[in-house]
């Protein structure tokens, strides 16, 4: 008999895997800008597929950590338990609610995933700067990304419960991922000298995907709004909806449009 935790992990991966495209997109954008910069500098031969795959793997693990952490802390707040309209797009993965994984196993999944991200990030930093803890944009985007991943719904920060979750999503899937990928992949140009890094172009390129991923999260908050409001998860939809016997969502829907 297959242990339920393994079945739960498989279910979680299967249901969440399509959403990894939200990570692939910003990494691909950062890589595309990096490739163009290398080509213009006549250094396209320095392109490293190994570094690209490491960046993509580290970013993907960060999203897995964010999703698992969200499942765990939305369970502890009771938000997912009282959600009456869960779907593949909202209400969490449901592996805790249907008993396929314990809350502890989900938390361990989050911690192991973020540990993998940190390990990859430190390795990339060492490859670019010569030191695991070299003071580079890789280190700082890694620190910010880790904070956003675990602090999205995690105690004691709980950005998503305080109305900052949407901003955290935009930052994490926009500038953090795009600019982090770009810095790693253009190391042969800037040679770890910040003034040589074409960060403005990478930042501009990150804005559209930051907004798009944030809107994906926002539109799926409408279904969660009643349960989120009940546990004090003050998303933008909850904050802008009119309260009463029935929650009226016309105002946040107009804002979304």
List each model region and its residues.
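Alpha-helical transmembrane segments of integral membrane proteins
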Residues: 18-22, 50-54, 105-109, 137-141, ...
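Small-residue-rich segments of transmembrane alpha-helices in multi-pass membrane proteins
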Residues: 24-30, 167-182, 237-245
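Single conserved hydrophobic/aromatic residue that forms the stacking wall/gate
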Residues: 1-8, 13
């Amino acid at each position: 008999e297959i242990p339920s935790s393994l079945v739960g992990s498989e279910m979680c991966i299967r249901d969440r895997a399509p959403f990894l495209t939200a990570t692939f997109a910003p990494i691909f954008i950062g890589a595309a800008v990096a490739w163009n910069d290398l080509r213009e500098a006549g250094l396209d031969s320095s392109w490293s597929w190994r570094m690209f795959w490491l960046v993509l793997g580290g970013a993907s693990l960060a999203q897995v950590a964010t999703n698992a952490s969200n499942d765990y802390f939305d369970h502890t707040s009771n938000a997912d338990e009282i959600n009456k309209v869960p779907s593949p797009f909202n209400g969490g993965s449901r592996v805790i609610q249907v008993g396929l994984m314990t809350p502890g196993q989900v938390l361990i999944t989050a911690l192991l995933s973020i540990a993998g991200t940190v390990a990859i990030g430190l390795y990339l930093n060492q490859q670019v700067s010569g030191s695991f803890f070299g003071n580079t944009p890789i280190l700082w985007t890694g620190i910010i990304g880790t904070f956003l991943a675990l602090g999205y719904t995690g105690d004691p920060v709980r950005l998503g419960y305080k109305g900052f979750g949407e901003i955290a999503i935009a930052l994490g899937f926009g500038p953090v991922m795009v600019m982090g990928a770009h810095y790693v992949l253009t190391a042969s140009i800037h040679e770890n000298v910040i003034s040589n890094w074409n960060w403005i172009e990478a930042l501009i390129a990150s804005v559209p995907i930051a907004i798009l991923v944030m809107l994906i999260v926002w539109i799926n908050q409408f279904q969660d709004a009643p349960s989120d409001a009940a546990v004090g998860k003050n998303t933008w939809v909850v904050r802008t909806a009119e309260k009463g016997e029935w929650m009226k969502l016309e105002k946040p829907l107009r804002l979304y449009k």
